[in-house]
C-alpha cells in the first residue's frame, strides 16, 4: 500500500473513533510537507478534509500549516452547524403542517461521528409521502426556499442558505437489482420510522434495519456507476458498529442475497474491519458467504473520490458499467460507448434532453468540450474512460453483481 493511502486510512480511522493512535503518531513524525499535501488532497477528493485536518492538528507533524487547517476546520464546523439548525427548523415546520418527513443519510450519519459537524454534507435528503408533496412545497416556499429543479423531477432540489435539500417521494423509485424491485422493501418505512438525536435536536428517520439496508443500496448505486468514495463506507461501518443491537443480521443477509449484494457487502465490511476500526463481532457473517477479497475494492474506492467524481474519464465510464449491469450491451466497453451514450443515459446531467431528445448531439458536444477543457486529447480521454469501465465491470463480476463480460 502507498504510504499516502496508509496515512490517509489511519488518520480517518482515528477520526471515526475520536482517538489519536500510536500508529498515527508514529506516521505523523515522518510526514513531510509533500506527504501531508498528498494526504490532504485525497481527503479533499473524498470530502473528509475536516476530519483529517482535525487529526493532523492534534498530531502536529513537521511543516504542518496549522493556521490554514484550523481555518478550514472552523469554517466547516460553523457552516455545518448552521445547516443542521436550518434542517431542524424545516422538519419542525413540516411536522407542524402535518407532514411526516424522514431525514435520510446526511444528519443521521453525521451524528455517528465523535465530532458530527466535521463530517461534511453537501445537502440533506428528506423523504415524504407522494400525497403530501403539494403542502410540502408550500412549507418550503414559506421558509424562503427556492426550487432549483423541475417540479416534475422525481427528486426536487430546494435551496435556502445555508441548506440544500433533496426532497424525495420515493426512496428507490423504479430501481431494480437482480430482477427485484427495491422500493417494496421500504413501502411501510413510515410506519416503522423512529426518532433520532442529531445533536442539536431530533428528527424522524428510517428504522435502523431500513436505514442500514438503504445505505448499502445507495453505496451500490454509486459503485455501479462512476464509483463510490470512502465517506459512504465510513458511514456504513459506523452505523453497523454503533447500531449492532438494532440490526437483525440474519434477515439482512437474506435480503442482500436476494439482491445479489451479499458478496459486495461483506467485502465492504471487511475493509471496515481491516482499515476503519469496525469490530468484526458487530457484523456476523454466515459461512455460506465467500471469504472477502477486498483490496481491489479499496483501490477502486480510493481512486473514485466522492460519488466517483475524481475525473471526467471515471464519470464517463459509468455508461459502460451501467450497460453491462443491465446486460443491454455486451460490447459496451468501447470508446464509442464512452463518448456517445443515449439520450436517456444523459437526461440527469442535461435536463433539456427530457423534453427535447433531438438535442442529443448537442449533449455529446458538451461532453467532448468537457474533455477538451481539461487539456487532454479527446481520443485518449475516451479510451481511458473505456479502460476504466472495463476494469470496473471486472469488479462487478468479481463481487457477483453481474455475469456478463465485455
List PLM regions with ranges.
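Conserved NTP-donor binding/palm subdomain of two-metal-ion nucleotidyltransferases/polymerases, i.e.
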Residues: 1-122, 128-406
Amino acid at each position: 500500500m502507498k504510504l499516502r493511502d496508509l496515512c490517509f486510512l489511519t488518520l480517518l480511522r482515528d477520526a471515526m473513533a475520536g482517538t489519536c493512535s500510536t500508529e498515527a503518531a508514529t506516521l505523523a513524525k515522518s510526514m513531510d510537507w509533500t506527504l501531508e499535501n498528498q494526504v490532504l488532497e485525497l481527503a479533499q477528493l473524498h470530502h473528509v478534509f475536516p476530519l483529517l485536518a482535525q487529526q493532523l492538528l492534534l498530531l502536529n507533524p513537521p511543516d504542518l500549516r496549522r493556521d490554514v487547517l484550523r481555518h478550514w476546520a472552523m469554517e466547516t464546523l460553523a457552516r455545518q452547524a448552521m445547516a443542521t439548525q436550518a434542517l431542524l427548523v424545516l422538519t419542525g415546520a413540516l411536522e407542524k403542517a402535518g407532514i411526516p418527513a424522514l431525514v435520510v443519510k446526511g444528519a443521521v450519519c453525521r451524528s455517528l461521528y465523535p465530532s458530527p459537524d466535521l463530517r461534511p454534507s453537501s445537502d440533506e435528503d428528506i423523504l415524504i409521502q407522494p400525497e403530501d408533496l403539494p403542502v410540502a412545497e408550500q412549507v418550503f416556499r414559506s421558509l424562503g426556499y427556492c426550487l432549483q429543479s423541475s417540479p416534475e423531477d422525481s427528486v426536487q432540489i430546494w435551496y435556502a442558505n445555508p441548506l440544500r435539500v433533496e426532497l424525495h417521494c420515493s426512496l428507490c423509485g423504479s430501481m431494480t437489482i437482480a430482477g427485484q424491485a427495491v422500493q417494496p422493501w421500504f413501502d411501510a418505512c413510515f410506519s416503522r420510522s423512529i426518532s433520532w438525536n442529531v445533536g442539536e435536536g431530533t428528527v424522524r428517520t428510517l428504522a435502523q434495519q431500513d436505514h442500514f439496508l438503504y445505505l448499502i443500496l445507495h453505496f451500490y448505486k454509486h459503485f455501479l456507476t462512476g464509483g463510490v468514495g470512502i465517506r459512504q463506507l465510513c458511514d456504513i461501518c459506523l452505523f453497523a458498529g454503533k447500531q449492532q443491537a438494532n440490526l437483525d443480521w440474519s434477515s439482512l443477509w437474506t435480503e442482500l442475497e436476494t439482491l445479489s449484494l451479499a458478496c459486495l457487502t461483506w467485502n465492504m465490511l471487511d475493509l471496515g474491519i481491516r482499515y476503519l476500526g469496525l469490530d468484526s463481532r458487530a457484523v456476523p457473517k454466515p459461512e455460506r458467504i465467500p471469504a472477502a477479497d477486498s483490496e481491489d475494492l479499496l483501490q477502486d474506492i480510493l481512486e473514485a473520490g466522492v460519488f466517483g467524481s475524481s475525473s471526467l474519464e471515471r464519470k464517463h465510464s459509468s455508461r459502460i458499467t451501467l450497460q453491462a449491469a443491465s446486460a443491454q450491451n455486451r460490447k459496451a466497453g468501447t470508446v464509442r460507448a464512452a463518448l456517445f451514450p443515449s439520450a436517456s443515459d444523459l437526461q440527469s446531467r442535461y435536463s433539456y434532453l427530457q423534453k427535447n431528445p433531438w438535442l442529443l448531439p448537442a449533449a455529446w458536444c458538451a461532453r467532448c468540450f468537457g474533455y477538451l477543457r481539461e487539456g487532454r486529447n479527446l481520443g485518449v480521454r475516451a479510451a481511458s474512460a473505456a479502460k476504466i469501465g472495463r476494469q470496473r465491470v471486472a469488479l462487478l463480476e468479481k463481487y457477483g453483481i453481474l455475469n456478463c463480460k465485455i
